Amino acid sequence: MSDVVVVIPARYGASRLPGKPLLDLHGEPMIARVWQRACKSDATRVVIATDDERIEAAMQPYGADVMLTAPDHPSGTDRLAEVAARLELDADTIVVNVQGDEPLLPPALIDQVVRRLADDTTASIATLAEPIGDVETLFNPNVVKVVRDLHGRALYFSRAPVPWDREHFATRPDCLATDAWLRHIGLYAYRAGFLAAYVDWLPSPLEQLEQLEQLRAMHHGHRIQVALAAEAHPAGVDTEADLARVRRLIAEGEGAA
């Protein structure tokens, strides 16, 4: 297998939780707990990509590999591409985007998404999904849904409830009749060569409608492998309520790094 580089994009200026990467989680900044999780994967290198020297300073005592990147990247994917270019990675090197607000991420999921991409040489990206078990989640536009083909490749990602159950939703919109619905998990593995091409493309029409970056790759004909997550994927930290929940789980020992 090619080398695997995990990149953790960490922006200081989160709109809902300013300074989110440095929020305290029982004596450690959130970004440190994410980094510790990533280091337990089989990756050959873990890099924190940040736009702020405060994050770099906070991670120095840990001996973390931190790269200061441009402050004006429109997305985490663009930040990944900068890291891949500066590291002069081989085109076949697998680069994993681990969100900087997921301090409970199981390292096994990082390894799973890497294997999925390594096993399909025709794919440029691999990601994960998990079953949706309730109507509220299915119809929530903040939850991204994905539809796959027979080979596990993505057919489409949407904020809408896809696929649409024409028969049952007309009579029982409060009931899921099958297990056809999948929630996308935002953990990605890319080939470094793909990242170099991606940042030169303009946003695609469907990407702009749905506000989903991965649709840009599909617009240009790139395949995305989607594996069913081998274990539960704990939600990240987007709100004060999420922060309280994660702190409680860590206190109870469920979030041990």
Swiss-Prot record:
GO MF, one example: 3-deoxy-manno-octulosonate cytidylyltransferase activity
InterPro entries to which the protein is assigned, alphabetical: Cytidylyl_trans, KdsB, Nucleotide-diphossugar_trans
Keyword Chloroplast found: no
Pathway note: Nucleotide-sugar biosynthesis; CMP-3-deoxy-D-manno-octulosonate biosynthesis; CMP-3-deoxy-D-manno-octulosonate from 3-deoxy-D-manno-octulosonate and CTP: step 1/1; Bacterial outer membrane biogenesis; lipopolysaccharide biosynthesis
Alphabetical UniProt keywords: Cytoplasm, Lipopolysaccharide biosynthesis, Nucleotidyltransferase, Transferase
Catalytic activity: 3-deoxy-alpha-D-manno-oct-2-ulosonate + CTP = CMP-3-deoxy-beta-D-manno-octulosonate + diphosphate
Pfam family, one: CTP_transf_3
Record HAMAP family: KdsB
Stated role: Activates KDO (a required 8-carbon sugar) for incorporation into bacterial lipopolysaccharide in Gram-negative bacteria.
Protein name, UniProt field: 3-deoxy-manno-octulosonate cytidylyltransferase
